[in-house]
Amino acid sequence: METDLNSQDRKDLDKFIKFFALKTVQVIVQARLGEKICTRSSSSPTGSDWFNLAIKDIPEVTHEAKKALAGQLPAVGRSMCVEISLKTSEGDSMELEIWCLEMNEKCDKEIKVSYAVYNRLSLLLKSLLAITRVTPAYRLSRKQGHEYVILYRIYFGDVQLNGLGEGFQTVRVGTVGTPVGTITLSCAYRINLAFMSTRHFERTPPIMGIIIDHFVDRPYPSSSPMHPCNYRTAGEDTGVACPSVEDSQEVCATSFSTSPPSQLMVPGKEGGVPLGPSQPAHAAQADQERLATYTPSDGAHCAATPSSSEDAETVSNSSEGRASPHDVLETIFVRKVGAFVNKPINQVTLTSLDIPFAMFAPKNLELEDADPMVNPPDSPETTSPLQGSLHSDGSSGGSSGHTQDDFVMIDFKPAFSKDDILPMDLGTFYREFQNPPQLSSLSLDIGAQSMAEDLDSLPEKLAAHEKNVREFDAFVETLQ
């Protein structure tokens, strides 16, 4: 398509579309991992991440997305699709949803590539983060395990909606206008999941042949394999590592820098692995799928949320006698204790919470009951205007005890006040204005009396003004 873009704007636009497609795949797949993702923001962004979002990339997902794109970009007539499906342990599968990134011919030639397109793609990616967690597949992904797993497949071409069955619904995430076309991101998802309980899943032909090593050339190059989002069989070895994110993607080196910070790298067995809640593992499987996440099914479990019944700061591992496959992740959930810090007391009483830093005090807890700082002595009862206003004359003797229980009177002693300076004492001023007197203007009798007095004195005031009328005229002449 012929446009008026210069070479630099065209290069930036292609780069934005490329990395938006890669980040779209990351967001969709990470939303189907079955775990909550928590990322930390940073006040010092760099150019290693994109679209003002700290999305930690899974290297294998990025690798598969680049293989599916094969150097192409979503354009008019070329769509990138991410298919999410479900597969049981018996081999039955069912498509759940299909995410489509496409472009139409409607152009916006007035928009600026370097700022407007980039910021709108960032907003579209944030919308995708929210919408991926409201479709039915998200709830299924949170319950995946030994009975079924969630798979993903990336392909480039026409959208295939036949596997969604009848009555599927579509939702449009959003659109972004560019000088070469309008980018559209949409989703079609299955809503009829009632037949899942009867295990009557739709049979689909194998997408690829059975491969022992998935790095060998596939017998069907035109097909794309399915990848479990969050599953690993027992006894698998993670001997093959994917290229790291830093090696597989470029740095945002445009004329501006509004990208989130770079990822922290932790040395692993065979190279740097990005530290994050979605740690991938790469392994070969005996059927047509390959593995893409970190959660093993041999009992190893990583606590994801503090609301779980287990301790949210430790990693529970049921396998004994061997190292955990995600030892790197333990640094995220284990509380780090600094040097020269005593172990906190497990049982902390309520009285110890009244004093700041009570757990570091050298005294014993049993002496706190006699401490006047913890349990101050009872102050004598005092009478104040506020207390008198609270106990009205109409209150009966039976309700006076209940009122005293509800209102606790405290003798107000302001700081830095002196008793000998009564007119300037802040406490006296405060007590006087707690119960201010009624305004005289609000009383009808007093108002009527004052008005009558004013009317009686009116003739005298008029006579005084008539007597001094010459003085008033002379004063007016001096003003002229």
UniProtKB/Swiss-Prot annotation:
N-acetylmethionine modifications at: M1
Biased composition (Polar residues): 305-321
GO molecular function terms listed in the Swiss-Prot or TrEMBL record: protein kinase regulator activity
PTM sites of type Phosphoserine: S318, S319, S324
Region described as Important for interaction with ATG101: 127-134
GO biological process per UniProt: autophagosome assembly; mitophagy; piecemeal microautophagy of the nucleus; protein localization to phagophore assembly site
Keyword Acetylation: yes
Gene3D superfamilies the record matches: HORMA domain
Compartments where located: Cytoplasm, Cytosol; Preautophagosomal structure
Keywords tagged on the record: Acetylation, Autophagy, Cytoplasm, Phosphoprotein
Ranges spanned by the short sequence motif LIR, renumbered to the chain: 407-410
InterPro entries for this protein: ATG13, HORMA_dom_sf
Region (Disordered): 254-323, 368-403
Cellular-component GO terms for this entry: Atg1/ULK1 kinase complex; autophagosome; cytosol; phagophore assembly site
Post-translational modification, as annotated: Phosphorylated by ULK1, ULK2 and mTOR. Phosphorylation status depends on nutrient-rich conditions; dephosphorylated during starvation or following treatment with rapamycin. ULK1-mediated phosphorylation of ATG13 at Ser-318 is required for efficient clearance of depolarized mitochondria.
Main localization, broad class: cytoplasm
Cited function: Autophagy factor required for autophagosome formation and mitophagy. Target of the TOR kinase signaling pathway that regulates autophagy through the control of the phosphorylation status of ATG13 and ULK1, and the regulation of the ATG13-ULK1-RB1CC1 complex. Through its regulation of ULK1 activity, plays a role in the regulation of the kinase activity of mTORC1 and cell proliferation.
Subunit (UniProt): Part of a complex consisting of ATG13, ULK1 and RB1CC1. Interacts with ATG101. Interacts with ULK1 (via C-terminus). Interacts with ULK2 (via C-terminus). Interacts (via the LIR motif) with GABARAP, GABARAPL, GABARAPL2. Interacts (via the LIR motif) with MAP1LC3A, MAP1LC3B and MAP1LC3C. Interacts with TAB2 and TAB3. Interacts with C9orf72.
Family: Belongs to the ATG13 family. Metazoan subfamily.
Protein name: Autophagy-related protein 13
Phylogenetic classification of the source organism: Eukaryota, Metazoa, Chordata, Craniata, Vertebrata
